[in-house]
């Protein structure tokens, strides 16, 4: 029952990872959208380490101190720290990241080396040549 109460009142998040969408735009381009309502760009960190995309919220110590001074009757909107991580192939390159209306969008593409890209081979048509001997 305590667990149910804490979920209903929002005292503990159901998940520390934010919701996200991953969309394939075409053969080589993708977009990752992460729901981060209430976060400013200064409070978010996006990095790639060892082919792992990491998205983290950064703690704000000053705001935590200010929050402690408030006498909450009910606090249903929480802004908890989170960390979400995705393993990337070495061929994935990030184009950009932007934050708009509480959604962090990352655009990335599959950078296939030229030697791995499909190549069309043209077919020549040979004409029959008759030899007159």
From Swiss-Prot:
SUPFAM superfamilies: HSP20-like chaperones
Matches recorded under Gene3D superfamilies: 2.60.40.790
sHSP domain mapped to chain residues: 11-126
CDD domains registered for this protein in UniProt: ACD_IbpA-B_like
Keywords on record: Plasmid, Stress response
Domain of life: Bacteria
PANTHER family: PTHR47062, SMALL HEAT SHOCK PROTEIN IBPA
The family this protein is said to belong to: Belongs to the small heat shock protein (HSP20) family.
Protein name: Small heat shock protein ibp
Gene name of the record: ibp
């Amino acid at each position: 029952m305590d667990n149910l109460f804490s979920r209903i009142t929002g005292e503990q998040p159901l998940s520390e990872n934010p919701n996200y969408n991953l969309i394939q735009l075409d053969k080589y381009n993708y977009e990752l959208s992460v729901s981060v309502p209430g976060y400013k760009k200064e409070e978010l960190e996006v990095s790639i380490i060892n082919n792992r995309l990491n998205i983290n919220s950064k703690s704000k110590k000053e705001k935590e101190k200010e929050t402690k001074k408030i006498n909450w009757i009910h606090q249903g909107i929480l802004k908890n720290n989170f960390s979400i991580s995705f393993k990337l192939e070495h061929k994935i390159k990030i184009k950009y990241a932007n934050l708009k209306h509480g959604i962090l969008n990352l655009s990335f593409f599959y950078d296939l080396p030229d030697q791995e890209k499909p190549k069309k081979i043209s077919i020549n048509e040979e004409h029959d040549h008759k030899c007159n001997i």
